[in-house]
């Protein structure tokens, strides 16, 4: 797992009490084209967007390897980004949610649907 920003700066948040930036690799790409050049092998781009073409999250089958793209709360994902996505998903409702909340809902859905196998030496 890793997190990334495109055309933006990562700001440490006082609400991030676990210091996520120190535990998960953070990549910053200057633009969307740079991100596209650095997508890991066999990864699917999933746009999270209120769009008529998008599938509802509760019906969505997550691919094994995915990059979830979330746009700005006020403008969403640009059309040229949505066109590059392999799939689009949306949450129910008519209003945009906070990006952090949306990301948490999508990742919770993924964790609930996609089995994770830990190595034999892993201790819980």
Residues of each region from the PLM?
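RNA substrate-binding interface of SAM-dependent RNA methyltransferases
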Residues: 1-50, 111-112
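Short secondary-structure transition/capping segments
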Residues: 12-19, 58-60, 101-102
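Active-site/ligand-binding-proximal alpha/beta "capping" segment
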Residues: 51-91
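Short, surface-exposed linear patches
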Residues: 25-27, 49, 67-71, 90-93, ...
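Structured adenosyl-cofactor binding patch, chiefly the S-adenosyl-L-methionine
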Residues: 79-123
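Conserved RecA-like P-loop NTPase ATPase core
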Residues: 45, 69, 102
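A short acidic, often aromatic-flanked loop/helix-cap motif at beta-alpha or helix-coil junctions
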Residues: 32-36, 53-55, 96-98
